[in-house]
Amino acid sequence: MKHELRINNYVLYDNRPFQIASISDEYPSLKTIEFGFGVVEWNDISPIPLTEELLVKCKGVKLAHYINCYNVNGIQLILRGGWFEYVHDIHIKSLHQFQNFYFFTKQQELTIEL
């Protein structure tokens, strides 16, 4: 996961979502409300599983004519066996992977209300 992350990606730390503030080989730092930036260990952060609830928080719209299919600003995702995949068979398992894919596709950050 370390090499998948970008600044502003969301991860779990202490079972709470935080955004990555900076990245180095030794450690990442997180943006926190309590004390600004916080340095943590790589082993202490984990990906946030991508769920239907999160897709709604990303302004996703469930497509009524498909089972488990969402549209997030023109990107169509289908829930298949515990992961989401884009219409071109790209497996997306976590929020940070979707953030990166969205940025690559749309050239802008994904809006999320966590």
Predicted regions and their residues:
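Intrinsically disordered, low-complexity, charged/polar segments
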Residues: G36-K62, L95-T105, L114
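Short intrinsically disordered terminal tails
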Residues: M1-L5, Q108-L114
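Acidic, low-complexity, intrinsically disordered interaction modules
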Residues: I23, Y27-N43, K62-L95
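Compositionally biased amphipathic helical and low-complexity segments enriched in hydrophobic
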Residues: R6, Y13, K31, V56, ...
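Short beta-strand-centered aromatic/proline hotspots
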Residues: H3, N9-Y10, R16-I33
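Short, solvent-exposed secondary-structure boundary motifs
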Residues: N8-L12, E52-C58, A64-V72
